[in-house]
Amino acid sequence: STSLEVRKLVYLVVLRYAKSHPDLALLSINSFQRDLADPNPLIRGMALRTLSGIHLREVSELVMMAVNKASRDPHPYVRRIAAYALPTCYNLDHGNYERLVECLKTFFCDRSPSVLGAATSIFQNLCPDRWDLLHRHFRKLCYALGDMSEWAQPTCMLVLTRYSRANISKPSSTHVDPDLQVLLTSLSAQTASMNPAVVVSVVRAFSALFPERLSAVFPALIRLLRSPPDVSYVVVLHAIELLRSSFVDISPYLTAFYVRASDPAYLALAKLYVLVHSASASQASDLAHELATYTRSSCITVALRSVTALGQLASRHEGVALQSLQLLVNVTQVPTLSTPVLSRAVHVVQSLLHTCSPSTAAVVVVRFALRLFVPLANRVRDPDAPRIRILTDTVSRVAVLWMLGLHLKTCLAGSSLLELIVPDLLRCLVAHWSKEQASVQCQALTLSAKAFVPVSYTHL
């Protein structure tokens, strides 16, 4: 047929059914061989792609001959397809390896960036350690990097990075190898690419070659955080990797990692890790308020992780420990807060009490203790004030009793907590004993023992 569209359809049908109907596919070989000499480069390229995509060992030699011929084709489109056909030739017959390497040398001598991009991709798959093939062409590949296909660029960057690490001396603050400088300059020019894979590859290359200059390309990675969630997640994972390597300071870009309401859970959790571990002391206060907002997320996983992150932030920056403690106490008073998040918040408060003064700890403990039973809560609530949420879950009740036992002797308003609240609390516990879980009962007995010991020693 003279119709290009009909020919495309025929090529697709042959590729689709070649494995299930090999005899019929073999009958079409002569047609493909004639098309390899067609004046139209599109037809020549499609014929070569179809011939190499049949994957029949009977035609392995024909495919090899077609690739050899196409490697000298006047049109770069055909030469690029010939380059991508090399792995197929190797899979059909491993004995063609040396011949394929010779073909690859021909492609590296090409002047077309599209062919060079295909050649580097095939090099990575076919002979990734044959550095002798690249020695003469290293700078040419660096200069052609910007003109390659955006999907060939990441592979080419990987190949050039591996070559540099294996064959070029490591840079220092005073000396950078000229070849490496050429590569770094070419890489820097790709940070404006609209393809996220290219930008990520640039950052990875700098991290491997010259991490001291990462700060120059890191803003391009931050720009990708405005991309769809799957791309943003990859960006955050790379930011975490760089954060652990300590080669770049992420704190100036902290707000870019703030969690959005539309972020899926997996992305929000990764962002929370970056926020907690990259915040500076001057940013900790604002971040604490931001994390407190996340605790009200509709996603339980994000809310739980936000509560934990608030505690981690307080542990990393002592200056915001008291603020974080107060924010967590406020979080526990939210009426709509889910029980798992409430339990986690009480547990984190329990772990942070040692960071504040005894008087502050006493106030926090009393506020939680009054929320164990309705009579105690009503005793301090104004008639017009909203109802106080009672801590009904087992984990929270055990944590409050533990905190109260730890601070029995702490004074508040001239009296110890043992005198202020413990007797009334124990009476309520006894009245509701049969309704309490075993862990709460055990902690209540421990509290009673701690309360009895100082009293008994006083009367001795």
Regions found by a protein language model. Name each.
Residues 25-29, 59-64, 94-101, 130-139, ...:
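Core helices of alpha-solenoid repeat scaffolds
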Residues 31-33, 66-68, 103-105, 140-142, ...:
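Buried hydrophobic core positions in alpha-solenoid tandem helical repeats
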Residues 458-459:
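Conserved small/polar residues in nucleotide/adenosyl-binding loops
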